[in-house]
Amino acid sequence: MLPTGFLWSQSIEDVQRFSQTTYLGSARYMGAGGAFTSLGNDFSAAHQNPAGFAVFRRTELSLSLGGLNSGTSTSFKGSTRIEDLGGFNFGNIGLVLALPEENGWKWNVGMSLNKGADYTNRLTTNGETNGISRINMWMENSQGFDPDDLLDAGRVHEWMAFQSYLTDSDGEFNYSTQANIEDVNSVYTIDQKGGMNEFALLFATEKDNRWYFGGALGIPFINYTRDIVYSERFGLGDSITSFDLKEHNEISGVGFNIKLGAQYRFDNGFRAGAALHTPSWYTMEQSWEDEMFTRFNDGSVLEPITSVYSDPYTWKLSTPWRGLLGISKVFGKSGFISVDYELNAMNTARSKSDSINIDYLDQEIKAFTQLSHIVRAGAELRLNRFYLRGGYSFQTSGLNGNFEETNTNMISIGAGYRGNDLSIDFVYALRNTGQDVYFYDAQYSPSAQSDITQKPLTFTMSYRIGNR
């Protein structure tokens, strides 16, 4: 178990990751770009604006499944490495019960489990970083400390580097290295897995076929695993040829939130909608394990020096408030066009812990976050019982200029068939974002440029029963 001086591993990137919702859900929702704040009749849309849950006219059961490809192209020192991962993708499962009309009010109740985000991603890059070594940072951070005091001072990797003979100390606690850090080839690999799913209890009501109101109690849960392998290979030196640092991090969490929404239908086919999302109040459980290996000129390998916090620790995260506005034009039974705007107030996120000190994280949130703006647009064309859909969304980064993260774009195309009781829909989407990747602390580390693309293919089947 580590001493209380340890610097905990939560980061502003974790806050950004767990605060973003990409709504990987039903095929109809994704096919029209997620622009459903003023529309409804879709389970994934109910997680966005629960007022649209009142648009369902019949009891319905729906299931969305498919596949997801995650690709990364990373450029460093003139070379590019490409990684591709593919696998199964759950989108949504939902049930709505259309209750009998009472006194002019129509009520729907139900539940839905929706995919909110997918964290699956792998990134690999390598290249010459001559004169720039992680050992430089470890030596600088160790200066003035007795090696036996490094752990108590929270300098875990510095302690591991000393124990692994990557650094050495003289009697005055000045640190040096036997590695040839003027001739360095660095290799960086990060493998991320997991996602966020949200279970919601939904209710909605409709009055006079004009006003729609709804609410949702959301229970999101997160599973996230990150494995990083960072290696340096040195030219000829006194004794050290290379080292590997392996970092394993696991985070799981469950929370709750409340969503409220309203919609209004005008006589001329226009519809307007608005929704407010409270923060998701998460309780996170986290654990990690690091290993360091050192290789020497004689071919020997030092047994790994392992640093483990043996018991998982907990911390709390409150994600940002979110506000949504939408307007759409419905062309009778021919289709619709729709536009949404969403404001994600990243600077309202907060963190705390009763057992560890993570005050620095709120300071980073205040210093490095900004408002994130999302615009979604979509259209649906009806051809008798067949439907064609297209959509686009644009999102600005919630991190300010201190982080080189580009805006996120997503385009989608889809189609569907709607019978009397059975509907089948599919969608293919492409979501792209970019960011600078630092191998370690940005103050010391070289950076690579990464382009990340997600390509979900989702099928939805819905079955309706009864009549209202």
PLM-predicted stretches and their roles:
Residues 20-38:
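N-terminal targeting signals for Sec/Tat export/insertion, comprising classic cleavable signal peptides
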Residues 1-13:
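Bacterial Sec-dependent N-terminal signal peptides
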Residues 27, 39-48, 54-130, 194-197:
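Outer-membrane beta-barrel translocator/receptor signature
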Residues 3-5, 51, 65, 390:
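Residue-level signal for alpha-helical transmembrane segments in multi-pass membrane proteins
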Residues 10-24, 98-468:
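Outer-membrane beta-barrel porins/channels
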Residues 48-49, 445:
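Short structured motifs
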